[in-house]
Amino acid sequence: MKKEKAVVVFSGGQDSTTCLFWAIEQFAEVEAVTFNYNQRHKLEIDCAAEIAKELGIKHTVLDMSLLNQLAPNALTRTDMEITHEEGELPSTFVDGRNLLFLSFAAVLAKQVGARHIVTGVCETDFSGYPDCRDVFVKSLNVTLNLSMDYPFVIHTPLMWINKAETWKLSDELGAFEFVREKTLTCYNGIIGDGCGECPACQLRKAGLDTYLQEREGANN
Protein backbone atom coordinates (compact mmCIF):
# COMPACT_ATOMS: atom_id res chain seq x y z
CA MET A 1 0.00 0.00 0.00
CA LYS A 2 3.05 2.23 0.30
CA LYS A 3 2.70 3.43 -3.31
CA GLU A 4 -0.98 4.29 -3.04
CA LYS A 5 -3.08 7.22 -1.85
CA ALA A 6 -5.66 7.41 0.93
CA VAL A 7 -8.31 9.80 2.22
CA VAL A 8 -8.88 9.85 5.99
CA VAL A 9 -12.25 10.84 7.47
CA PHE A 10 -10.91 13.27 10.05
CA SER A 11 -12.54 15.04 13.00
CA GLY A 12 -9.46 16.03 14.97
CA GLY A 13 -10.38 13.59 17.74
CA GLN A 14 -8.33 10.81 19.31
CA ASP A 15 -9.58 8.05 17.04
CA SER A 16 -9.37 9.82 13.70
CA THR A 17 -5.97 11.34 14.54
CA THR A 18 -4.64 7.90 15.42
CA CYS A 19 -6.02 6.71 12.08
CA LEU A 20 -4.33 9.63 10.33
CA PHE A 21 -0.95 8.61 11.76
CA TRP A 22 -1.72 4.99 10.80
CA ALA A 23 -2.49 6.07 7.23
CA ILE A 24 0.72 8.12 7.01
CA GLU A 25 2.60 4.91 7.89
CA GLN A 26 0.68 2.80 5.37
CA PHE A 27 0.34 5.00 2.28
CA ALA A 28 2.56 7.11 0.03
CA GLU A 29 0.13 10.03 0.02
CA VAL A 30 -2.62 10.97 2.48
CA GLU A 31 -5.37 13.58 2.45
CA ALA A 32 -7.88 14.35 5.21
CA VAL A 33 -11.53 15.34 4.94
CA THR A 34 -13.54 16.96 7.73
CA PHE A 35 -17.29 17.52 7.72
CA ASN A 36 -18.98 20.64 9.04
CA TYR A 37 -22.42 19.53 10.19
CA ASN A 38 -23.01 22.41 12.63
CA GLN A 39 -21.52 20.44 15.49
CA ARG A 40 -21.69 22.12 18.91
CA HIS A 41 -18.09 23.21 18.81
CA LYS A 42 -16.64 24.62 15.60
CA LEU A 43 -13.37 24.23 17.49
CA GLU A 44 -13.46 20.62 16.25
CA ILE A 45 -12.99 21.85 12.68
CA ASP A 46 -10.26 24.29 13.72
CA CYS A 47 -8.51 21.53 15.65
CA ALA A 48 -8.61 19.20 12.64
CA ALA A 49 -7.25 21.96 10.39
CA GLU A 50 -4.43 22.72 12.82
CA ILE A 51 -3.40 19.07 13.09
CA ALA A 52 -3.48 18.59 9.31
CA LYS A 53 -1.37 21.72 8.84
CA GLU A 54 1.18 20.59 11.41
CA LEU A 55 1.48 17.18 9.76
CA GLY A 56 1.63 18.63 6.25
CA ILE A 57 -1.57 16.91 5.15
CA LYS A 58 -3.89 18.38 2.51
CA HIS A 59 -7.18 19.07 4.29
CA THR A 60 -10.67 19.52 2.84
CA VAL A 61 -13.68 20.72 4.84
CA LEU A 62 -17.09 19.85 3.37
CA ASP A 63 -20.37 21.50 4.35
CA MET A 64 -22.79 18.89 5.71
CA SER A 65 -25.03 21.28 7.64
CA LEU A 66 -28.11 19.64 6.11
CA LEU A 67 -27.56 16.82 8.65
CA ASN A 68 -28.65 19.15 11.44
CA GLN A 69 -31.74 20.03 9.44
CA LEU A 70 -32.62 16.38 8.81
CA ALA A 71 -31.63 14.82 12.13
CA PRO A 72 -31.49 17.20 15.13
CA ASN A 73 -29.35 15.69 17.87
CA ALA A 74 -27.31 16.53 20.96
CA LEU A 75 -24.10 16.90 18.96
CA THR A 76 -25.54 19.79 16.95
CA ARG A 77 -28.18 21.28 19.25
CA THR A 78 -27.13 23.09 22.43
CA ASP A 79 -30.72 22.90 23.68
CA MET A 80 -30.59 19.08 23.71
CA GLU A 81 -29.02 17.29 26.66
CA ILE A 82 -26.41 14.57 26.10
CA THR A 83 -28.09 11.43 27.46
CA HIS A 84 -27.88 7.66 27.05
CA GLU A 85 -30.81 5.68 28.41
CA GLU A 86 -30.40 1.92 28.71
CA GLY A 87 -31.76 0.14 25.66
CA GLU A 88 -31.86 3.32 23.58
CA LEU A 89 -29.46 5.03 21.20
CA PRO A 90 -27.49 7.90 22.80
CA SER A 91 -28.79 11.40 22.09
CA THR A 92 -25.45 12.01 20.36
CA PHE A 93 -26.30 9.54 17.58
CA VAL A 94 -26.79 11.30 14.24
CA ASP A 95 -28.90 9.29 11.79
CA GLY A 96 -27.01 8.69 8.56
CA ARG A 97 -23.81 10.43 9.64
CA ASN A 98 -21.27 7.74 8.81
CA LEU A 99 -23.28 6.69 5.76
CA LEU A 100 -23.04 10.21 4.36
CA PHE A 101 -19.49 10.92 5.57
CA LEU A 102 -18.08 7.78 3.98
CA SER A 103 -20.08 8.32 0.79
CA PHE A 104 -18.81 11.88 0.38
CA ALA A 105 -15.30 10.79 1.33
CA ALA A 106 -15.51 8.23 -1.47
CA VAL A 107 -16.58 10.86 -4.01
CA LEU A 108 -13.62 13.02 -2.93
CA ALA A 109 -11.26 10.04 -2.99
CA LYS A 110 -12.19 9.21 -6.57
CA GLN A 111 -11.72 12.84 -7.62
CA VAL A 112 -8.20 12.97 -6.14
CA GLY A 113 -7.19 9.54 -7.44
CA ALA A 114 -7.31 7.66 -4.16
CA ARG A 115 -9.01 4.32 -3.72
CA HIS A 116 -8.32 3.88 -0.01
CA ILE A 117 -10.60 5.45 2.63
CA VAL A 118 -9.69 5.34 6.32
CA THR A 119 -12.19 5.83 9.14
CA GLY A 120 -11.93 5.51 12.92
CA VAL A 121 -15.24 3.76 13.56
CA CYS A 122 -15.04 1.07 16.21
CA GLU A 123 -17.43 -1.72 17.12
CA THR A 124 -15.79 -2.42 20.49
CA ASP A 125 -16.73 0.97 21.98
CA PHE A 126 -19.50 1.79 19.53
CA SER A 127 -22.03 2.86 22.21
CA GLY A 128 -24.87 1.30 20.26
CA TYR A 129 -24.23 3.31 17.08
CA PRO A 130 -25.43 1.07 14.22
CA ASP A 131 -23.25 2.88 11.65
CA CYS A 132 -20.06 1.94 13.51
CA ARG A 133 -20.57 -1.77 12.92
CA ASP A 134 -18.21 -3.78 10.74
CA VAL A 135 -21.13 -5.26 8.79
CA PHE A 136 -22.30 -1.75 7.88
CA VAL A 137 -18.86 -0.64 6.68
CA LYS A 138 -18.36 -3.78 4.58
CA SER A 139 -21.84 -3.40 3.09
CA LEU A 140 -21.25 0.25 2.24
CA ASN A 141 -17.87 -0.59 0.72
CA VAL A 142 -19.58 -2.91 -1.76
CA THR A 143 -22.31 -0.34 -2.46
CA LEU A 144 -19.80 2.44 -3.13
CA ASN A 145 -17.79 0.23 -5.46
CA LEU A 146 -20.92 -0.61 -7.42
CA SER A 147 -22.28 2.93 -7.44
CA MET A 148 -19.11 4.49 -8.86
CA ASP A 149 -17.58 1.46 -10.58
CA TYR A 150 -14.39 2.09 -8.62
CA PRO A 151 -12.30 -0.26 -6.42
CA PHE A 152 -12.58 1.52 -3.07
CA VAL A 153 -11.16 -0.13 0.05
CA ILE A 154 -12.47 1.18 3.38
CA HIS A 155 -9.96 0.64 6.21
CA THR A 156 -11.05 0.55 9.85
CA PRO A 157 -7.85 0.20 11.94
CA LEU A 158 -9.74 0.58 15.22
CA MET A 159 -12.71 -1.66 14.48
CA TRP A 160 -11.86 -4.47 16.89
CA ILE A 161 -9.81 -2.66 19.53
CA ASN A 162 -10.88 -0.81 22.67
CA LYS A 163 -9.81 2.64 23.87
CA ALA A 164 -6.79 1.34 25.79
CA GLU A 165 -5.61 -0.48 22.67
CA THR A 166 -6.19 2.68 20.62
CA TRP A 167 -3.83 4.52 22.97
CA LYS A 168 -1.35 1.67 22.55
CA LEU A 169 -1.58 1.97 18.76
CA SER A 170 -0.89 5.71 18.90
CA ASP A 171 2.15 4.96 21.07
CA GLU A 172 3.40 2.34 18.59
CA LEU A 173 3.00 4.94 15.83
CA GLY A 174 5.11 7.42 17.82
CA ALA A 175 2.12 9.71 18.25
CA PHE A 176 1.03 9.16 21.86
CA GLU A 177 1.87 12.62 23.24
CA PHE A 178 0.63 14.34 20.08
CA VAL A 179 -2.73 12.57 20.29
CA ARG A 180 -3.05 13.19 24.02
CA GLU A 181 -2.24 16.90 23.88
CA LYS A 182 -3.60 18.10 20.53
CA THR A 183 -6.80 16.18 19.79
CA LEU A 184 -10.37 17.15 20.64
CA THR A 185 -12.67 14.39 21.87
CA CYS A 186 -14.60 16.35 24.50
CA TYR A 187 -18.28 17.16 23.83
CA ASN A 188 -17.67 20.41 25.72
CA GLY A 189 -14.94 21.52 23.33
CA ILE A 190 -11.85 21.23 25.55
CA ILE A 191 -8.70 20.07 23.74
CA GLY A 192 -6.43 17.43 25.28
CA ASP A 193 -7.68 15.63 28.37
CA GLY A 194 -11.00 17.49 28.08
CA CYS A 195 -13.60 18.25 30.74
CA GLY A 196 -13.44 14.81 32.31
CA GLU A 197 -17.21 14.73 32.73
CA CYS A 198 -18.88 14.12 29.36
CA PRO A 199 -19.26 10.52 28.07
CA ALA A 200 -16.54 11.01 25.44
CA CYS A 201 -14.03 12.23 28.03
CA GLN A 202 -14.88 9.44 30.45
CA LEU A 203 -14.37 6.80 27.76
CA ARG A 204 -11.11 8.41 26.66
CA LYS A 205 -9.78 8.69 30.24
CA ALA A 206 -10.73 5.13 31.15
CA GLY A 207 -8.82 3.86 28.14
CA LEU A 208 -5.84 6.10 28.87
CA ASP A 209 -5.65 5.04 32.52
CA THR A 210 -5.83 1.37 31.57
CA TYR A 211 -3.12 1.72 28.93
CA LEU A 212 -0.79 3.70 31.20
CA GLN A 213 -1.14 1.03 33.89
CA GLU A 214 -0.37 -1.68 31.35
CA ARG A 215 2.61 0.25 29.96
CA GLU A 216 4.00 0.87 33.43
CA GLY A 217 3.58 -2.80 34.30
CA ALA A 218 5.38 -3.85 31.13
CA ASN A 219 8.29 -1.51 31.91
CA ASN A 220 8.75 -2.81 35.47
Curated annotation (Swiss-Prot):
Binding of Zn(2+), residues: C186, C195, C198, C201
Listed pathway(s): Purine metabolism; 7-cyano-7-deazaguanine biosynthesis
Names of the cofactor(s): Zn(2+)
Quaternary structure and partners: Homodimer.
Function description: Catalyzes the ATP-dependent conversion of 7-carboxy-7-deazaguanine (CDG) to 7-cyano-7-deazaguanine (preQ(0)).
Family: Belongs to the QueC family.
UniProt protein name: 7-cyano-7-deazaguanine synthase
Organism: Bacillus cereus (strain B4264)
Taxonomy of the source species: Bacteria, Bacillati, Bacillota, Bacilli, Bacillales
Gene for this chain: queC
